[in-house]
Amino acid sequence: MLNFLFSSPADSLALRAFLAFLTALVIGLACGPALIRELKKLHFGQAVRTDGPKTHLAKDGTPTMGGALILAAITLSTLCWADLGNRFIWVVLFVTLGYGAIGWIDDYRKIVHHDPHGMSAREKFSWQSVIGLAAAFYLALALAVEPGGTFAEAIGAWYDARFPLDVTANIHLYLPLWTDWAFPLGLIGFIVFVYIVIVGSSNAVNLTDGLDGLAILPTVLVGSALGLYAYAAGNPDFAGAAYAAAAPHIPGAEELAVLAAALAGAGLAFLWFNAHPAQVFMGDVGALALGGCLGTMAVVARVELILAVMGGIFVVETLSVMIQTTYFRFSHGKRVFLMAPIHHHFELKGWQETQVVVRFWIITFILTALGLSVLALH
């Protein structure tokens, strides 16, 4: 919206990313207190599970749905400073806001019906699947578009070629540090793979969001790193050497650095109010959306496997739930962990909430640095 102030969007990318960060940060810090007051007035408080750690009972009634502020800050800042003609900006916003809408409905039902579970798992997963599959199909063809091309042209070319299942080499799977190896996924394989990445990332961040500040700082760290990878993928001077020699140049991917900067600013502003003891929770409206945002950015930059490394905390949290649920079912009631997700296990082992959070932050910082080291090595 405001990028017309710059003669060349490409040349002003770093400045626009900084302005996006600053704009989102100011929006979050300025509007946070008013939002918290309004949520309290509406009695939009979190219903706490009674089977969890007893220290969490004091959190009952804490305002939730604060993730709406994160999404508003990201969206407004991105619309102000990003190149709105960029095809990748819109697909990331589509997933982010679409998953945010699912989360908003889920949170609203929890509050109105005083039910900690909200939407049924089947209903939530169904809507996540619709958005995830739509984004996956879009990305499969959008990655085939040459610089200056349009999505409609990609659809037309695909139709003229009688719907080939391998649209472009850009939809291969690339391994970090591999010099020239790329696994061809084909159109169907790519859509399924992207669907898993987006939906999996969304649910992983949502599962992690169980303690004050636990999910938001890792999201900021990983999102910022993905912004750097997106810049590398879209820059012809770096593409192909960013993390694997076979990795493609993705024209337009660099613009996601602006959105990633907005995410970082909005996330840090939210952390100001979400730090222990939290004044507000992000709720599913924030957690589902931010996870989907991370997954989609990773797909555009073609660093899905690096996302799994940098977001290791999200992966472990998800695996702990899967292991606990599976073992409980087949062992007739026995458990591997005292409670899942695993951050509750450590609480029940005697760790203070702040110890769990800060230690998980430290692990994420190390994993993010490890993920970025691949970029530095090349």
Spans of features found by a protein language model:
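Juxtamembrane helix-loop transition segments at the membrane interface in multi-pass membrane proteins
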Residues: 42-44, 114, 285
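Membrane-interfacial loop-to-helix junctions in multi-pass inner-membrane proteins
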Residues: 85-93, 112-127
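Membrane interface segments of multi-pass transport proteins and intramembrane proteases
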Residues: 110-120, 177-183, 352
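Alpha-helical transmembrane segments
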Residues: 2-40, 70-103, 133-173, 190-378
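Juxtamembrane helix-capping/reentrant segments at transmembrane boundaries
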Residues: 49-62, 116-128, 343
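A cross-family signal for N-terminal binding/gating loops and helix N-caps
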Residues: 40-45, 51-53, 57, 69
